[in-house]
From Swiss-Prot:
HAMAP family: EF_G_EF_2_B
Any GO BP: ribosome disassembly
Function (record text): Catalyzes the GTP-dependent ribosomal translocation step during translation elongation. During this step, the ribosome changes from the pre-translocational (PRE) to the post-translocational (POST) state as the newly formed A-site-bound peptidyl-tRNA and P-site-bound deacylated tRNA move to the P and E sites, respectively. Catalyzes the coordinated movement of the two tRNA molecules, the mRNA and conformational changes in the ribosome.
One cellular-component annotation, GO: cytoplasm
Transmembrane segments: none
Binding residue positions for GTP: 17-24, 88-92, 142-145
Protein name: Elongation factor G
Membership in a protein family: Belongs to the TRAFAC class translation factor GTPase superfamily. Classic translation factor GTPase family. EF-G/EF-2 subfamily.
Keywords noted in UniProt: Cytoplasm, Elongation factor, GTP-binding, Nucleotide-binding, Protein biosynthesis
GO MF annotations, alphabetized: GTP binding; GTPase activity; guanosine tetraphosphate binding; translation elongation factor activity
Location in or out of the cell: Cytoplasm
Species of origin: Idiomarina loihiensis (strain ATCC BAA-735 / DSM 15497 / L2-TR)
Length: 707
């Protein structure tokens, strides 16, 4: 089967935003205008087509990123048909993992901001993630019909809070209740969308007289931004002082793809104005799969390989989301980077070294689906029938193996114990949790060996609430949930030298392992991928006093003991262990003996090295009305918070930034609501581990050891 749409006409984009900036409504309008959903779904009444899990419709927030394919030829039918794959991403802070996961497989992004609340903490997080993956993006300032809407103030915030090179490509005509449409600064025309047919048709009109000067000014800035794309355009601009429409678009495209500038459009998705022009901009300024850097990966021989976006290359794809579907079982969403895959083909998952056969393939549209026979480079689709694939795994051609880089998932910071309400549900709960953990790598399940309880861990209280909620709805398992537990860690404060000796020589084959270790605290560094390095092992053995083959066993023994902790059973972070001496026995020494010697030495040494308990510190930002500021700050101080600063926030509010221990943040949402009559909002993300004060450490240790 030949390709229907050439790969140059593909756009794989994500729509990302802060909670409530109107992202799902924006996506809905995109689906409406591209002719897929004939009735516009409103989030206000819980009917949006992208939000397909029940809880999303109830809470009015988007949790799972659904992938949707649609086609667009332009507002004026001015383009050949383009294929746009959209990934809707959640904006709530507990789900940043979903956003990270989607950005990894996108080529471009549309960031939706609210015209009245502007750049919010979550936007900054999304922006940082998009920078990390070098995703070219444009911004849609939505809700221009809202009270307090101010387009230029949002553009200014983008420059100050996101350090973005923001260039307006439109200006709003009117604002709040009088919002009428936008001026296209490239064409220098007022776009007036018709109210009768929900904005499907429009007319180009002259710019309102009172806006001409302002439009000229911003048109000038736009042309300058385009001219800086290359020398040819610059020279023409310097000679003639103007560029043609095609040249402006060409220049803006080059600079957007290079991440030099970020174009800003505006409108109101709810009022059916502006989204149509954003679709045009996606096609004109965001990249096709062939215009982003080809993806690299590790080949079988550990060297680096490259896969270009082409059907001729060997097949490679990345699984970026797993979803459980009541009818077909597991759906594995993949982004195809290269090659072609037909229904029934075999693929290999090099991460787990397993072969898989692709049963069926479907193209998703929100929650409806159509069966397809093949996928090609650039496609985003869901595969059915894969048995052992987790988020972030690679699927590739068995004859040309490649492992595309793994996605990095943050460590969970909060845990709760769960138990089924009836004994009969125990097994069902295990199955449900297993499925949910396969879908979401930032959610973990383990059984506490001592108490036998099932412990679930995640990125925040809302995250775990939704997991428990989904067990009840999708798997019909009701649970009792225990008190939240904090993921503490341990560390050493002093350097020590210590001996570990494991000897059993009482007849028969004995055991003999003997090591001298130096343990030192080390500051946690980041490696090239931005992952934390929390442990280093250095081998300084000379003259073979400990034979080479036993050295990895010593390292392993130390690491196993580090996982078990020495104070209260929490893993130890930030240790440099140097093996510098020891001895062995020709007959009785074994890997096992040296592993035990290493772990004994670590335990003894860590207890002598002035160990400390570390607690997770959260970066908290509270946006509050000024009159509640005193209460908010006082409350954060009571929670052992360290106030880092206060600044103006949009809409006359104040932003308070603080570092607060996670253990003090439980139930914060409820307390904040009552202090500020529900007018404040907060966001929280993990920042670092820091030493816990003695009184807290003693309390935690007493509780742990009492068990």
């Amino acid at each position: 089967m030949a390709r229907k749409t050439s790969i140059e006409r593909y756009r794989n984009i994500g729509i990302c935003a802060h909670v409530d900036a109107g992202k799902t409504t924006t996506t809905e309008r995109v689906l409406f205008y591209t002719g897929l959903s004939h009735k516009i779904g409103e989030v206000h009444d819980g009917a949006a087509t992208m939000d397909w899990m029940e809880q999303e419709q109830e809470r009015g927030i988007t949790i799972t990123s659904a992938a949707t394919t649609c086609f667009w030829q332009g507002m004026d039918k001015q383009f050949p048909e383009h294929r746009v794959n959209i990934i809707d991403t959640p904006g709530h802070v507990d789900f940043t993992i979903e956003v990270e996961r989607s950005l990894r497989v996108l080529d471009g992004a549309v960031v939706v901001l609210c015209a009245s609340s502007g750049v919010q903490p979550q936007t900054e997080t999304v922006w940082r993630q998009a920078n990390k993956y070098e995703v070219p993006r444009m911004v849609f300032v939505n809700k221009m019909d809202r009270a307090g809407a101010d387009f230029l103030s949002v553009v200014h915030q983008m420059k100050t809070r996101l350090a973005a090179q923001a260039v307006p490509m439109q200006l709003p005509v009117g604002a709040e209740d009088n919002f009428r449409g936008v001026v296209d600064l490239v064409k220098m025309k007022f776009i007036n969308w018709s109210e009768e047919d929900m904005g499907t048709s429009f007319t180009y009109e002259d710019i309102p007289a009172d806006m001409v000067d302002e439009c000229e000014k911003y048109h000038g800035e736009l042309v300058e931004a385009a001219a800086e794309a290359n020398e040819e355009l610059m020279n023409k601009y310097l000679e003639e002082g103007e560029l043609t429409e095609a040249e402006i678009k060409q220049g803006l495209r080059i600079r957007t793809l290079a991440n030099d500038i970020c174009l800003v459009a505006c409108g109101s998705a709810f009022k059916n104005k502006g989204v149509q022009a954003v679709l045009d901009a996606v096609i004109e300024y965001l990249p096709s799969p062939t215009e982003v850097k080809p993806i690299t990966g590790i080949l079988d021989d550990e060297s680096e390989g490259v896969r270009k976006s082409s059907d001729e290359e060997p097949f490679s794809a990345l699984a970026f989301k797993i979803a459980t579907d009541p009818f077909v079982g597991t759906l594995t969403f993949v982004r195809v980077y290269s090659g072609v895959l037909n229904q029934g083909d075999g693929v290999v998952n090099p991460v787990k070294n397993k072969k898989e056969r692709v049963g069926r393939m479907v193209q998703m549209h929100s929650n409806s689906r159509e069966e397809i026979k093949e996928v090609r480079a650039g496609d985003i689709a869901a595969l059915i029938g894969l048995k052992d694939v987790t988020t972030g795994d690679t699927l590739c051609d068995p004859a040309h193996k490649i492992t595309l880089e793994r996605m990095e998932f943050p460590e969970p910071v909060i845990s709760v114990a769960v138990e089924p309400k009836t004994k009969a549900d125990q097994e069902k709960m295990g199955i449900a949790l297993g499925k949910l953990a396969a879908e979401d790598p930032s959610f973990r399940v383990k059984t506490d060996e001592e108490s036998g309880q099932t412990i679930i861990s995640g990125m925040g209280e809302l995250h775990l609430d939704i997991i428990v909620d989904r067990m009840k709805r999708e798997f019909k398992v009701e649970c009792n949930v225990g008190q939240p537990q904090v993921a503490y860690r341990e560390a050493i404060r002093d350097a020590v030298e210590i001996e570990g000796k494991f000897v059993r020589q009482s007849g028969g084959r004995g055991q003999f392992g003997h090591v001298w270790l130096k343990l030192e605290p080390m500051t946690i560094e980041e490696d090239a991928n931005g992952d934390d390095i929390t442990y280093k092992f250095v081998n300084e053995i000379v003259g073979g006093v400990v034979p080479k083959e036993y050295i990895p066993a010593v390292d392993k023994g130390i690491q196993e003991q580090m996982q078990q902790g020495v104070l209260a059973g929490y893993p130890v972070l930030g240790v440099k262990a140097t093996l510098y001496d020891g001895s062995y026995h020709d007959v009785d020494s074994s890997e096992m003996a040296f592993k035990i010697a290493g772990s004994m030495a670590f335990k003894k040494g860590a207890l002598k090295a002035n160990p400390a308990l570390l607690e997770p510190m959260m970066k908290v930002e509270v946006i509050t009305p000024e009159e509640s500021m005193g209460d908010v700050v006082g409350d954060l101080n009571r929670r052992r918070g360290l106030i880092e600063g206060m600044e103006e926030a949009p809409g006359g509010l104040k932003a308070v930034n603080a570092q607060v221990p996670l253990s003090e943040m439980f139930g914060y949402a409820t307390d904040l609501r009552s202090q500020t009559q529900g007018r404040a909002s907060y966001s929280m993300e993990f920042l670092k581990y820091a030493e816990a004060p003695n009184n807290i450490a003693e309390k935690v240790m007493a509780e742990r050891n009492a068990k």
